[in-house]
Structures are given as C-alpha cells and as structure tokens.
C-alpha cells in the first residue's frame, strides 16, 4: 500500500500533452469547426493540417458505409451516431502509412519511433502473475487517470439538434478515466425518437458482430491513454482469468476493494476506490429528460459480488464453458443479434448457452455473467466501465476472442459486410471514435496490433502452426471415424479368408505326393480366388 501511495503522489505531478483518441477532439469542439464540419487539426510537428507537409496524412471527405443494416433499428436519420461521424463532421484526417491520431501525430498500434517504423509487441499479463510493485503501479496509474483532465478530448453534453446544429457547442471537460466511461456509455445509450419516446434496441458496441472488435479497439485506446498520462510507454493492461473462479478474487483491499463493513453495496474505506465517484449511471433519468450524460458525479462506486440473481447466473464460467464457446466455428449467424444461435460472438458475449450454442433470454453466461455477478456499477451496461474491474474482465474476454481467431483462422470475409444491426457492418466506422476506424480493421489477430497475452505467447509457434490443421481434423472427425471402422472390417474379412485358405492347404498337404503338380496348383488358385 505504501508503494502505491508513493507512486500516486509522484505521478500526480505529471500532465502530459499528447495527441489522443476518443470522441470529440478539443480542437474540433468550436462553433466554427462544427459549422464547417471539418475536423482536421494541425499537427504541431510541421504546423500543417493532419501533418500533410510531412506526409503523415491528408484532410479527406468521410465516406460512410452504404451497406444495408438490420431491422433492429427501423429508423434513419434520427440519431447522431448513424453513419458516424457525418452528423458532426464530414471531413477528417486520413492518416497514411503507420501514422495515426486525430491529427496523424502518433503511431499505429504495434509501431513506435519518430517515423513510426519500429515494430514492437507488448505482453499483457494475468494480474495474479504480476509482482506487487507492478500491481501497485497499475492501481496508482488508475487513480492518476481519474484525477487528470484530458487535454485533447472533451465530451458532448447535448445532441447535435440541441447544439442548434453546431452554432451552440455543448461540450465539457472530462478526466482521462471517465472519458472512457463516457465513450462506453455513448456507444450503448438509447436513441431519442422524434415523438418524444426512446428506442432501446440499439447499441453500437454490444449485441452484434462489433462487440469483440469494438472492445478490442476501446482497450487499446485506453491502454495508450494510460501510457501517456503516466509517461510509461511500457504499460500494458492486465487481465483477470476468471475461469472456474468461485468468487471475486479481485474484490479485496489489496486489489480493487473489499466489501464495506456496514454496507454490502459499498467498497471498504481501506481501498483507494472507495472514494471514486461514478458517472453515466442513470440511463432512465437521461431518457426521461432527453439529455446526454454530462460527466457529473453521481455517487460512489457500487459492488456487491455474488449477491445477484442466481437463477439468471448460477455460477461464473468454467473452463468447459470457455472451450465449448471457442469450439463454435461460425463467428456470426442468423439476424446477428442477441438471439443468434451457434454464434461464437453471441456465445462469448453471453446471450447463448456455451454447451449448446443456443440463445437463452433467461440466462446470462460468459462475458455477461461477470457483469451480473458483480451486482453493482458494473451491472449497468451503459455505466459498467466505472468499475476498474471492467478493464481486466474485458481484457480476458479479448484474449478469448484472440484464441478463437488463432484457432479458426477466419478471413475478413467472415465478418458480415451487410445486414448487421446498425453500426456493426464491416465497413461501419466504430462509434464514437475519432480518428475513424471500421469494425473490420480490428477483426485481426492481436500480434498485428502489437500486443499478446502471456498465456498465449507461452504456447509457442508450434501450436500456432498446428491449430488450423487440428481444427480441420475436428471438423471431419466423423468421416475419419467412419473410414477407420470400414478399414477395420475389411481387414478382418481379409484375415478370415487367409486363415480359411491356410487351413484348407494344410488338409490337402498329406496327399500332395499322389497328385499331379499342375492340378495341385490349379486347385489351389481356384480355391483362393473363390474364397476371396
């Protein structure tokens, strides 16, 4: 605890100004920019828009996907997130080569160096395999992010219509940690309809094909923001391997807070996190008032692990559940929503039963089961990122997505190009991020993005080589078994024939000397051929 306190005290002196990722770049939040609809900030390195003079990028028109979407959201042109980010901006920086960022001032994931030409691969570790110093440093970084205002990004506190179509900007400052809470909220919030009602069956980050790649991108951005705010380029997100867990092993004061001695819903006062305030946790109130979460503190972090609805989630996922999920060969099926059967994505997300792959509305499995089990701030979808356990949980979910990608080796065509729920088609820009990236761009293996997981990296290259062939064998095992059975029967028949022939030969051996040699040979061959 002492080392955590020292790290936190020292790190609060840091305020690093970097290009960043998130929703609205501060440089693009003025009325002038909103009215022009051009978000192409200057890169300070050469004082040109998007770093064009240095060949980093150019300011280009946004070209949204025109592929048809599913019927889950039967409206068009009523939500700011549709065809992201066209409502707010129709021109943004298009970065070139390995450059990245809202002004092309940074490197793509997996690259570093002044010209972004140096490859690097980071390893994410299981939190219980970290040293005490590593764990304490991680907790200190979280607290630092919670207390550091983002220098590059602001959050929207109103719809585009409420901003009078850009002439009256409505934005607010936000700390680095809460920026990502807000991003998760904004992607999953309900839609305001023109008749004054809301539409709940819409989510740009969940319940559809984009769930794994959206959260993969989200975690990478979160990881890089922590690296910047802590001035530690080697920082990686830890994960919690919750397979076969019987309880919340992280819910202690050493990690993310034990239970308060007099209130089951609050955290122990001995934990750093007991002082944390949550945001974006009142969706019903936002809908009633038709407002956007503005980042205002709404109360303490809540958590009551294990005191949940046992009928919905009887237990946490087992190793068998994980293996059953990973064995599903189809990434997406049917309507590609929470009712999809035999879908790896839907089973991983937790809307289908792992053992059968069949969707079940009455149960929460896999990813969803952890959210239900925590029974607090993490159980509210829109505000679930308030709990720091969210990050470790989703990092492990991302590692399972990675296992599936390596085992099944899908091509990009496996990710649906059209007819997915709004926001989830392959070429749809992920909401609400600037710079722009599509869902399909993160349907790739983690090593292509510059990171790996310790338990996957240890498996070695031989397993990576064999996995595709083992998977092919698994898919045709019925045919292999049938061939083996038929082969065994044929072998048995041939052995029987040879045995009978040999016995007949022995019976005729005693009279060989009294018979002509030619006749003996003819009889022998006739008998062999007849038996065969």
From Swiss-Prot:
Which residues does the annotation flag as glycosylated?
Answer: 90, 115, 165, 234, 341, 375
Q: What is this protein called?
A: Tyrosinase
- GO terms of biological process kind: melanin biosynthetic process from tyrosine; pigmentation; protein homotetramerization
Main localization of the protein? membrane
SUPFAM superfamilies named in the record: Di-copper centre-containing domain
Q: Where does Cu cation B bind?
A: 367, 371, 394
- Describe the family membership recorded for this protein in Swiss-Prot or TrEMBL: Belongs to the tyrosinase family.
- Annotated localization: Melanosome membrane
Glycoprotein as a keyword of this entry, yes or no, is yes
Residues in compartment: Cytoplasmic: 501-532
Modes of activity regulation: Activated by trypsin, chymotrypsin and subtilisin. Activated by alpha-chymotrypsin, thermolysin and Pronase. Inhibited by its product L-DOPA and tyrosine.
Recorded GO cellular component terms are:
melanosome; melanosome membrane
Expression is induced as follows: By seasons. Highest levels in the winter time and lowest during the summer (at protein level).
* Enzymatic reactions: 2 L-dopa + O2 = 2 L-dopaquinone + 2 H2O; L-tyrosine + O2 = L-dopaquinone + H2O
InterPro entries, alphabetized: Di-copper_centre_dom_sf, Tyrosinase/Hemocyanin, Tyrosinase_Cu-bd
Q: List the transmembrane segments.
A: 480-500
- Record-listed E.C. numbers: 1.14.18.1
Role played: This is a copper-containing oxidase that functions in the formation of pigments such as melanins and other polyphenolic compounds. Catalyzes the initial and rate limiting step in the cascade of reactions leading to melanin production from tyrosine. In addition to hydroxylating tyrosine to DOPA (3,4-dihydroxyphenylalanine), also catalyzes the oxidation of DOPA to DOPA-quinone.
Lumenal, melanosome compartment segments: 23-479
Q: Which residues bind Cu cation A?
A: 184, 206, 215
- Give me the comment on cofactor binding: Binds 2 copper ions per subunit.
Give the Gene Ontology MF terms in alphabetical order.
Answer: copper ion binding; protein homodimerization activity; tyrosinase activity
| Known partners and oligomeric status | Active tyrosinase has been found as a homodimer and homotetramer.
């Amino acid at each position: 605890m002492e080392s955590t306190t020292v790290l936190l005290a020292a790190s609060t002196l840091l305020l690093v100004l970097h290009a960043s990722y998130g929703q609205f770049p501060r440089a693009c939040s003025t009325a002038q920019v909103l009215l022009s609809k051009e978000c192409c900030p200057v890169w300070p390195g050469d004082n040109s828009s998007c770093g064009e003079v240095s060949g980093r990028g150019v300011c280009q028109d946004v070209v949204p996907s025109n592929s048809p979407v599913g019927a889950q959201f039967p409206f068009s042109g009523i939500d700011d997130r549709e065809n992201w980010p066209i409502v707010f901006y129709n021109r943004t920086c298009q970065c070139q080569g390995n450059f990245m960022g809202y002004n092309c001032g940074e490197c793509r994931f997996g690259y570093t160096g002044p010209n972004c030409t140096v490859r690097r691969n980071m390893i994410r570790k299981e939190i219980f395999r970290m040293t005490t110093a590593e764990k304490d440093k991680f907790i200190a970084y979280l607290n630092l992010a919670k207390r550091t205002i983002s220098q590059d990004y602001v959050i929207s506190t109103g719809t585009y219509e409420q901003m009078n179509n850009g002439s009256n900007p409505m934005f607010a400052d936000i700390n680095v940690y809460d920026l990502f809470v807000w991003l998760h909220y904004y992607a999953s919030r309900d839609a305001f309809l023109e008749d004054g009602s809301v539409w709940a069956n819409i989510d740009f980050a969940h319940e559809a094909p984009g769930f794994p790649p959206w959260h993969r991108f989200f975690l990478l951005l979160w990881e890089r923001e922590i690296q910047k705010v802590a001035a530690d380029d080697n920082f990686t997100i830890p994960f919690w391997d919750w397979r076969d867990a019987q309880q919340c092993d992280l819910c202690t004061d050493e990690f993310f807070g034990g239970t308060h001695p007099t209130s089951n819903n609050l955290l122990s006062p001995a934990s750093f996190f007991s002082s944390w305030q949550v945001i974006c946790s009142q969706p019903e109130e936002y809908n009633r008032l038709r407002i956007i979460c503005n980042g205002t503190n709404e109360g303490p972090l809540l958590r009551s692990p294990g005191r949940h609805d046992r009928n919905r989630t009887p237990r946490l996922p087992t190793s068998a559940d994980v293996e059953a999920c990973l064995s599903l060969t189809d990434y997406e099926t049917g309507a590609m929503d929470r009712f999809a059967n035999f879908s790896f994505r839907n089973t991983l997300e937790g809307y289908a039963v792992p053992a059968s792959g069949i969707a079940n509305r009455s149960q929460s499995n896999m990813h969803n089961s952890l959210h239900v089990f925590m029974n607090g701030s993490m159980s509210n979808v829109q505000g679930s990122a308030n709990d720091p356990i969210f990050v470790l949980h989703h990092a492990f979910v991302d590692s399972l997505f990675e296992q599936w990608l390596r085992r099944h080796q899908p091509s990009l065509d496996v990710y649906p190009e059209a007819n997915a729920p709004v926001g989830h088609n392959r070429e749809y820009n992920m909401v609400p991020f600037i710079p722009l990236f599509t869902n399909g761009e993160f349907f790739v293996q983690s090593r292509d993005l510059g990171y790996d997981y310790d338990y996957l990296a240890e498996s070695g290259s031989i397993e990576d080589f064999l996995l595709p062939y083992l998977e092919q064998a698994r898919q045709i095992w019925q045919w292999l078994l049938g061939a083996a059975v038929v082969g065994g029967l044929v072998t048995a028949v041939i052995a029987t024939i040879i045995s009978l022939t040999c016995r007949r030969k022995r019976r005729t051996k005693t009279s060989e000397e009294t018979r002509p040699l030619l006749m003996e040979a003819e009889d022998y061959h006739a008998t062999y051929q007849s038996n065969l």
